[in-house]
Amino acid sequence: MSTREIRIATRKSALALWQAEYVKARLEQAHTGLQVTLVPMVSRGDKLLDAPLAKIGGKGLFVKELETALLDNEADIAVHSMKDVPMDFPEGLGLYCICEREDPRDAFVSNTFDSLETLPAGSIVGTSSLRRQAQLLARRPDLQIRFLRGNVNTRLAKLDAGEYDAIILAAAGLIRLGFEDRITSTISVDDSLPAGGQGAVGIECRSADVEIHALLAPLHHVDTADRVIAERALNKRLNGGCQVPIACYAVLEGDQLWLRGLVGQPSGGTLLVADARAPRAAAEALGVQVAEDLLGQGAEAILKEVYGEAGHP
């Protein structure tokens, strides 16, 4: 393969294609004459839309097929939503670029109500995330949480059809797809802590492709990467994936990194929260530290219960 050509493995969803096109445009802007093509494919997570993610189980639901394409030399890089990327990579692959983060917050979307606070008791709220469910029910145990999967357009259509009083989505996805006007209100990270890596785009490639690594370097955003490294370290220590009730969010404060982590019962009955600060150079250690604090509060028992109900380890 010539280093003047890059093939991007991507899922076929509108949001995934937006992310891949974004990376394509950035690469072409940074490297005159570089040919960039997309290799769209369907992941297991895209096929299994009739069950909650926690019930499907397994990590890498949205990335495994893309990684296979890299290993089989059918593509040169794979573009992912960072919140979907497992903590560990197959031998020969690695994460070599994290792009600048979009708004990491969750968004409240409703055609009738202005905010989570104004929802009447008994309102039906759609989400596919145990993380969101745990935090929503902790604040509003009077709400009904109903399963919601599908791409952004599908979820909005279900809301518009009256199946839900409100739905909760990642603000970043709505903004990127041009649906910012559908965001009724953004939810503060104090009220709904995001998933680790939410709003960030990551690029995976073969570890041996040093020329590709060099081409990706201009797209790497160090401030975002340091935050996401801390968040992912917490997730890794808790053995978490995108389908468990773990939340974490890091903020840069000068040369210091602040990280908050949360583990919650899906019922909202118990929310465990921990936070700490450390020099940004110690991002990974900070993630482990906050995870250890959560484990000391009893996070392991909550996560074992969730995994047990889902029927997978």
Swiss-Prot record:
Gene Ontology, cellular component aspect: cytoplasm
Catalytic activity, EC: 2.5.1.61
GO molecular function, one term: hydroxymethylbilane synthase activity
Known catalytic reactions: 4 porphobilinogen + H2O = hydroxymethylbilane + 4 NH4(+)
Pathway(s) per entry: Porphyrin-containing compound metabolism; protoporphyrin-IX biosynthesis; coproporphyrinogen-III from 5-aminolevulinate: step 2/4
GO BP terms: protoporphyrinogen IX biosynthetic process
Entry-linked CDD domains: PBP2_EcHMBS_like
Cofactor(s) essential for the protein: dipyrromethane
The organism's place on the tree of life at top rank: Bacteria
Pfam family, one: Porphobil_deamC
Record-linked PROSITE patterns: PORPHOBILINOGEN_DEAM
Keyword Transferase: yes
Keywords: Porphyrin biosynthesis, Transferase
Cofactor binding annotation: Binds 1 dipyrromethane group covalently.
Matches recorded under InterPro entries: HemC (IPR000860), Porphobilin_deaminase_cofac_BS (IPR022419), Porphobilin_deaminase_N (IPR022417), Porphobilinogen_deaminase_C (IPR022418), Porphobilinogen_deaminase_C_sf (IPR036803)
Positions carrying S-(dipyrrolylmethanemethyl)cysteine: 242
Function in brief: Tetrapolymerization of the monopyrrole PBG into the hydroxymethylbilane pre-uroporphyrinogen in several discrete steps.
Quaternary context: Monomer.
Protein family per UniProt: Belongs to the HMBS family.
Note, other: The porphobilinogen subunits are added to the dipyrromethane group.
Protein name: Porphobilinogen deaminase
Source species of the chain: Pseudomonas putida (strain ATCC 700007 / DSM 6899 / JCM 31910 / BCRC 17059 / LMG 24140 / F1)
Source species taxonomy: Bacteria, Pseudomonadati, Pseudomonadota, Gammaproteobacteria, Pseudomonadales
